[in-house]
Swiss-Prot record:
Keyword Zinc: no
Protein name, as recorded: Putative fimbrial assembly protein FimD, serogroup D
Keywords annotated in UniProt: Fimbrium biogenesis
PANTHER family from the UniProt entry: BETA-LACTAMASE FAMILY PROTEIN (AFU_ORTHOLOGUE AFUA_5G07500), BETA-LACTAMASE-RELATED
Gene symbol of the encoding locus: fimD
UniProt source species: Dichelobacter nodosus (Bacteroides nodosus)
Pfam families xref list: Beta-lactamase
InterPro entries per record: Beta-lactam-related, Beta-lactam/transpept-like, Beta-lactam_class-A_AS, Diverse_Enzym_Activities
Length: 394
C-alpha cells in the first residue's frame, strides 16, 4: 500500500512539474509560438469590448471583427468620413492585451506607406503651382550627372508618381528598407546616375519606394526647404496631430504586436533610416481619424487631384494592377463603384486608406503584422464590398 502511494505521489509530482515547467519553457524559448497559441482567447475577450462613436455605420464594427479574426490584430482603429461627419470605432489597447490604456480615437500609429498619399498630394500641388511638371526629368531637376543607363535620363515626375519609372524592388537590390544599410536616396542622389533600371520606363507598373524618395527630393528642390517643413505648412500637420517619426518610437505611439512576424520585432526600428531617408516614403504617424480628416480638408485644386491618373489601360478589377498619381483604383468585376486606396506596412503595423469620388474616406489601422500578405488583400476586398453596399444603399 505504501509503495503504491509513493508511486502515485511521484506521478503526481512529475505531472505537476511538467504542467508548470513546459509552458514556462515554451514561453521563454518560443514566445511567438506561445502568444500565437493564445491569440484566439485574446481575440474573444477583445471582441467583447468594441467601442464606436454615436451613429457609426454598422460596417465599421464588421471591419473591426474582420481585423481581429482574420488579420490577427487585437488593437485597431477604423475611421470613416461621410457627408462632413466623422465616425470611428476602436478595439483593444495602446499598451497590449488587457493593458491600462484602451485604444482611443487619437491613439498614434505609424502610417507606413500611407504616407505616400500625402507625398503625392504635395507633388501634385507643386505641379498645380507650376513649380514642377509631370514631364519634369528627375535627373535635370536634381542637377545630377549624365546617367550610365540612358533610360534613367527619361524618368519623369509622372513616372515616379505612378510607379512606372523602371525600378523593380523584386529584381534589383534597392536599400530603402534593408537592415543596417544607409539608402543612397536622398543623401547621395548622385547614385541615381549609376543605377541600372530593371525595365524600360512606362512599360510596366512596379511598386517602388525609391521612386517616392526621389519625389521627396524633388519637393525639396522645388521649394528650397526640407520636405518636412513644406508638408507641415501645406497640410497643417500639427492641427491634425500628425507627426513625422524619427529613429525611435514616439512617446505617445501605441505598442505593436509582432507575434505573426517571421523575423522582426521592435528592434527593427534601430536598423532602418527613418530620420534621414524614409520621411517621404513612410515617415508619418497619427490616428485613423487624423488622416481621414486631413484628406477631407485637402484644398480643391486643379487641374490635378489625388484622383488624377494616366489613361494607360490596366486591369482595374485586380488589386495592385493599376496606379494613379496618388492612389490605386479598384472596381470589382461586375460592379460600377470605384474605390481608390493606398496600403502600408511596417513590422507590427498594417494600414489602409480608401477614398471614393463622392467624398467618402475610410482608414483602417492595425497594430499587428498579418499572418500572410494574402490576408491583407482580402481585407481590402472586404472593405470594398462594405463601402460599395453602404454607398449604394444611401
Amino acid at each position: 500500500m505504501f509503495k503504491k502511494f509513493l508511486w502515485r505521489d511521484c506521478v503526481f509530482i512529475i505531472v505537476l512539474i511538467t504542467a508548470i515547467a513546459l509552458p514556462a519553457y515554451i514561453h521563454t524559448n518560443y514566445p511567438q509560438a506561445f502568444s500565437r497559441f493564445f491569440y484566439p482567447v485574446e481575440a474573444w475577450f477583445t471582441k467583447r469590448d468594441l467601442r464606436c462613436s454615436k451613429n457609426a455605420p454598422h460596417f465599421l464594427r464588421q471591419l473591426l471583427i474582420e481585423m481581429i479574426d482574420e488579420q490577427k490584430s487585437l488593437n485597431n482603429q477604423v475611421a470613416f468620413w461621410h457627408n462632413g461627419q466623422l465616425f470611428h470605432c476602436e478595439s483593444g489597447w495602446e499598451d497590449g492585451f488587457r493593458g491600462e490604456k484602451p485604444m482611443r480615437v487619437n491613439s498614434r500609429f505609424r502610417y507606413a506607406s500611407v504616407t505616400k498619399v500625402l507625398t503625392s498630394a504635395l507633388v501634385l500641388h507643386a505641379i498645380n503651382e507650376q513649380k514642377l511638371s509631370l514631364d519634369s526629368k528627375i535627373i535635370e531637376l536634381l542637377e545630377l550627372p549624365a546617367p550610365k543607363d540612358p533610360r534613367v535620363a527619361a524618368i519623369t515626375i509622372k513616372m515616379l508618381l505612378e510607379h512606372s519609372a523602371g525600378f523593380d524592388r523584386l529584381k534589383t537590390y534597392m536599400p530603402m528598407l534593408t537592415m543596417d544599410v544607409k539608402p543612397w536616396c536622398p543623401t547621395n542622389l548622385a547614385q541615381l546616375s549609376k543605377t541600372k533600371l530593371d525595365f524600360d520606363p512606362e512599360t510596366q507598373f512596379q511598386y517602388s519606394n525609391v521612386g517616392y524618395c526621389l519625389l521627396g527630393a524633388a519637393i525639396e528642390k522645388a521649394y528650397g526647404r526640407t520636405f518636412q517643413s513644406v508638408a507641415e505648412d501645406y497640410f497643417q500637420l500639427k492641427k491634425y496631430g500628425i507627426a513625422f517619426v524619427g529613429d525611435r518610437f514616439l512617446p505617445d505611439e501605441i505598442q505593436y504586436d509582432y507575434r505573426f512576424e517571421s523575423f522582426y520585432s521592435e528592434f527593427y526600428l534601430k536598423h532602418f533610416d527613418f530620420k534621414d531617408s524614409l520621411y517621404a516614403v513612410g515617415g508619418l504617424s497619427g490616428s485613423a481619424a487624423d488622416i481621414v480628416q486631413l484628406l477631407a480638408a485637402l484644398p480643391k485644386e486643379a487641374p490635378l487631384t489625388i484622383f488624377s491618373h494616366n489613361h494607360t489601360p490596366c486591369s482595374i478589377n485586380m488589386l495592385d494592377a493599376c496606379y494613379g498619381y496618388a492612389l490605386q483604383p479598384y472596381q470589382a468585376s461586375g460592379q460600377s463603384y470605384t474605390l481608390w486606396g493606398k496600403s502600408g506596412f511596417f513590422p507590427g503595423v498594417n494600414t489602409d486608406v480608401f477614398l471614393d469620388e463622392q467624398g467618402n474616406i475610410l482608414a483602417t489601422l492595425r497594430a499587428a503584422s498579418a499572418k500572410k500578405t494574402a490576408d491583407t488583400l482580402l481585407l481590402r476586398q472586404y472593405a470594398y464590398s462594405l463601402m460599395n453596399e453602404y454607398v449604394n444603399q444611401k
